Design a protein with these regions (language model features):
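Compositionally biased terminal segments of proteins
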Residues: 1-188
């Protein structure tokens, strides 16, 4: 995918290591036949809202297996993060990779599970725009103060992509999307 605007943002903000890390992680997972999906801020960039992010979020079927395979080569780029079982770090540039549970929700109270990746690929595959917005609204609605940036991501994606009111958003958060869309439309 690699949106040109997202690429330019990473180059101009000194965060180009994100792409290097994402590519290395998905190649390592593909070598072990593990499918993945990129979510989080990197997916937000690639879907058209060019904002800074500092980590890579990967949805995988089995977090512990993915951590094991990513860190198995002691001379490879990835090392475990002490005390955090779902995160590795790229020793070349310090970028963290957070591994997210396919088919499960992030935390208690959330209602939108992460999508199930099916394709094994050596190149990054991203969650769909609809999935991304659904996940962002779910995160925000369960922690509205601390996860305000997730709501902002949705607002900015609606504006940047000129999204329609009727979008295939997950049922538990569809009303949040419609309310946000309506509020933006009312401000025009």
């Amino acid at each position: 995918m690699w949106d040109p605007g997202a690429y330019e943002l990473r180059e101009n903000t000194g965060t180009s290591g994100l792409e290097q890390t994402a590519r290395a992680a998905v190649r390592a997972l593909a070598d072990r036949d593990i499918p993945h999906l990129v979510a989080g801020g990197l997916a937000v960039q690639e879907h058209g809202y060019h904002r800074v992010t500092l980590d890579v979020d990967l949805v995988v079927p089995d977090i512990l297996e993915a951590v094991e395979f990513l860190t198995a080569d002691l001379s490879g780029p990835f090392v475990r993060v002490a005390g955090v079982e779902d995160r590795v770090q790229d020793r070349r540039n310090g970028v963290f990779v957070d591994l997210l549970p396919a088919g499960k929700v992030l935390r208690r109270g959330c209602q939108v599970p992460f999508p199930e990746p099916v394709e094994v690929s050596e190149t990054p595959k991203f969650v769909s725009l609809e999935q991304l917005i659904s996940l962002k609204l779910d995160s925000w609605s369960n922690n509205p103060v601390r996860r305000l940036k997730d709501k902002v991501d949705v607002i900015e994606l609606i504006q940047a992509r000129h999204l329609p009111r009727e979008l295939n958003i997950a049922a538990p958060v569809r009303q949040h999307y419609v309310e946000t869309w309506d509020a933006l439309e009312a401000e025009h």
